[in-house]
Amino acid sequence: MSLLAVGINHNTASVELREKVAFGPDKLSEALKQLNANAHVNGSVILSTCNRTEVYCDVKGVAKNKLIDWLSVFHQVSPEELKPSIYIHEEQAAIKHLMRVACGLDSLVLGEPQILGQVKQAYTDSRDNKSVDASMEKLFQKSFSVAKRVRTETEIGGSAVSVAYAACTLAKHIFESIAESTVLLVGAGETIELVAKHLSANGCTKMIVANRTRERALGLAEEFGAEVISLNEIPDHLHRADIVISSTASPLPIIGKGMVETALKTRKHQPMLLVDIAVPRDVESQVGDLNDAYLYSVDDLQSIVDGNIEQRKVEAIQAEAIVSEESAAFMSWMRSLQAVDSIRDYRKSANEIREELLSKSLQSLAAGGDPEKVLLELSNKLTNKLIHAPTRALQSAAEQGEPAKLTVIRQSLGLENPQ
């Protein structure tokens, strides 16, 4: 087994190049088929996401540049355009890279959990296309267990590192269960869409989307089962909301102190969380002066995010140590397999010599040969055959002036004890 990882990612390549080299579902099967048709490739897995394209291979003697050339031809991208952005990892470096990727240590957002699912899907797709050999199977399964260990032993994924996620995390801290809470989302842009996804993933089913245009809001409503209202209708529905998360492009505040004060009276002063992640602000700052209204601005959330990013960097130190330990252990296992193969081949060779000479000796005895002479000849020939290769190795090491190699051979033959 000889491992090779070749790829590009968000650190080395522009989004335009990443788009060109991406393996969509329509290309993946053909790509794996072409890789496996190569006599030098024992197994392969292709990982292709918006931020990276990587090819992992178990190879035997294949030149690294041949794999790059294949990528170039397959995607019809010139080598001159591709090569400056390519990175190549071999053996333990390839093992360590895959483990870092699976753990989220090589991600654009440090510690993000989605990449593990993407690596698992890449492995499954490659296995379904019968391109995963036993060695690749072992490598990827080990990488999954390392990612699980990192998640268990560190807090690298435990803190919010996006404003949208931080808003949802804040809501979970304040309310015992957001599954029982009604959430009013003001706006229908990308940030609010991310917020809705995080809320839905945490069990929230009661969402109201308020937007200037109903068309955009209807898309979110259909995806998340939300109710749609216009911005003008917010005063009539605000009292229903336990949580308000707002992100619009409005130049003026949409939710004022008086509007919230009225809603709180209708709610009989049940607490209301308002998270304003718009710039300029959607919620008047004076709302924060009201009892039972808890207002957080984008700056409040950003400070939480910044602190969490720093915390993830601290946790990443321990995660990197785990990956280094596990990749070294896996490399040792790989080397032990190579030793097993060598031992098996050496025993096979010795047995073939023994059987050949024994057969000749038995024939001599059957023909009436002197048993003593036959046995003496057998022992001499067996000795000469078995020591021929080690003798040549000793001579070669001595002639080439390689004392270290000579010492290793002598130790292997039991001629001197290891220090």
Curated annotation (Swiss-Prot):
Coiled coil: none annotated. The keyword Kinase does not apply. NADP(+) binds at G187, A188, G189, E190, T191, I192. It is an enzyme of class 1 (oxidoreductase). The active site is at C50. Belongs to the glutamyl-tRNA reductase family. This is Glutamyl-tRNA reductase.
